[in-house]
UniProtKB/Swiss-Prot annotation:
EC number of this enzyme: 3.1.26.-
Function: Probable RNase involved in rRNA stability through maturation and/or degradation of precursor rRNAs. Binds to RNA in loop regions with AU-rich sequences.
SUPFAM superfamilies membership: FomD-like (SSF159234)
Gene: fau-1
GO BP field: rRNA processing
Single annotated GO MF: mRNA 3'-UTR AU-rich region binding
Name of the protein this chain belongs to: Probable ribonuclease FAU-1
Similarity remark: Belongs to the FAU-1 family.
Organism of origin: Sulfolobus acidocaldarius (strain ATCC 33909 / DSM 639 / JCM 8929 / NBRC 15157 / NCIMB 11770)
UniProt xrefs under Pfam families: DUF402
InterPro entries, per the entry: DUF402, FomD-like_sf, Ntdp-like, RNA-bd_FAU-1
Length: 418
């Protein structure tokens, strides 16, 4: 299988795909140089790249789910139940219980239900190199196609434009021969004219990377080029600064880690659900911290006004309440200690999650949907049903890890060791 790889994880991913028998194509000059490869200008079967959020990796094309699951054992992987570029028939503005926008009776899936809804366009015939539909006879190009290639592609599509077909050339088109391009357009126009969209559609995966797997990618990248710990996490905020530090003989992430929380304020805590949805929790002031070459630990004070209850603790939120939360890059949990205005402990809530990451004035972790609470000396594991429901996305390793950590925390709380 031929794979095109782009983004901040490209070096580590290239190493892993090569070691597992994949052929890397359309390499950037930098990647070709690092791996002593010739650039292969061949069409890709699958593209692997950063998501819109740099903490995600997406793949579009052939099915590589099993491979991705084998290397990212500690990250949720969402596999779209609906293929990208498939054509679906809807009922009451829904398909497979997902809302579709716009509300078309039939449409091409141009965005899978990553956020709970499917985005459609009018039906199109889609192939490896192009997509075709009836229109005003125009040609469009992927943003990844340069002007030199676009002239050749335009010469191929103009005859089809004259017949009233719109053609959009995909990035793979620049790697195909003229004969291959003509053959695909002929096939696509025929399929479109017969409304035959049965065979089209591409797998879409989204990996929401945990800190654990980012550190794994750091280790893999270090086999190819000088790489310090937290490289990929830091790359989400910094670019040149990371490169400059790694250009030193003995690079250290300490300075960059410290600069992420320079004013000792955390604006928000990003609580990321297994499906990738982000819930922003109230931030606060850093009251204690330790930052080293290979770890960081923070204690944050979060203050509250009255109104509502503490989820999981079933206690009222009152004026003057505050939370002292501890976050440690070495731990798979965060400890929340809720106090009243007189500094009396109201309850303790331990959120089971992947180790927390530092972004610019923010904390991010991946919630594992199970927590442990202690109120009035009674300890309970809560939300086990949520963990079970998310097992397919979390995968076996992460699911078992969450159960193991939750039980361990429960035991420690019962023994007053936390």
């Amino acid at each position: 299988m031929r794979v095109r790889i782009r983004g901040i994880y490209a070096t580590a991913l290239t190493y892993l795909f090569l070691k597992n028998g994949f052929e890397i194509v359309q390499q950037t000059p930098q990647i070709a140089e690092r791996f002593f490869m010739d650039i292969i200008r061949s069409p890709a079967d699958v593209t692997v790249k950063d998501g819109i959020d740099k903490g995600e990796i997406v793949s579009v094309g052939e099915d590589i789910y099993n491979f991705m699951r084998s290397i990212f054992k500690y990250s949720p992987i969402w596999r779209s139940p609906i293929k990208l570029y498939s054509v679906v028939s809807t009922e009451d503005c829904k398909f497979m219980n997902f809302i579709v926008e716009p509300c078309l009776s039939e449409g091409l899936v141009i965005k899978p239900p990553v956020e709970g809804k499917i985005i459609l366009s009018s039906p199109r015939a889609v192939g490896k190199f192009a997509m075709v539909w009836k229109g005003d006879g125009r040609t469009f190009f992927s943003e990844h196609i340069d002007e030199r290639d676009s002239q050749r592609l335009l010469s191929v599509s103009i005859p089809f434009n004259k017949k009233g077909y719109n053609v959009k050339w995909r990035s793979n088109a620049a790697m195909a021969t003229t004969a291959e391009l003509k053959e695909e357009l002929e096939n696509l126009t025929m399929r479109y004219s017969y409304n035959d969209f049965r065979e089209q559609g591409e797998d879409f995966l989204k990996v929401t990377l945990s800190l654990e797997d980012k550190l794994f990618l750091d280790d893999i990248r270090s086999l190819v080029i000088n790489t310090m710990k937290f490289h990929h996490m830091l790359k989400m905020t910094y670019s040149n600064e990371v490169d400059i530090e790694e250009g030193k003989v003995n690079p250290s992430p300490e300075k960059l880690l410290t600069s992420l929380i320079g004013d000792n304020m955390i604006e928000a805590i990003e609580h990321v659900k297994p499906n990738g949805k982000r819930v922003l929790l109230k931030g606060g002031t850093i009251v204690q911290k330790e930052i080293g070459r290979d770890y960081y630990w923070l204690k944050i004070r979060r203050e509250f006004k009255s109104g509502g209850i503490y989820d999981g603790l079933n206690l009222k939120i009152e004026d003057g309440d505050y939370d002292l939360v501890e976050l440690d890059s070495r731990n798979w949990y965060q400890i929340h200690r809720y106090h009243d205005r007189n500094n009396n402990l109201k309850g303790l809530y331990v959120n089971i999650s992947t180790p927390p990451e530092l972004l610019k004035n923010r904390i991010r972790y991946l919630d594992l949907e199970v927590d442990v609470v202690k109120v009035n000396n009674t300890v309970n594991i809560i939300d086990l049903e949520e963990l079970e429901a998310n097992k397919p996305i979390l995968g076996e390793f992460l699911y078992k890890k969450a159960l193991e950590i939750a039980q361990n925390i429960k035991d420690k709380l019962n023994e007053d060791k936390i």
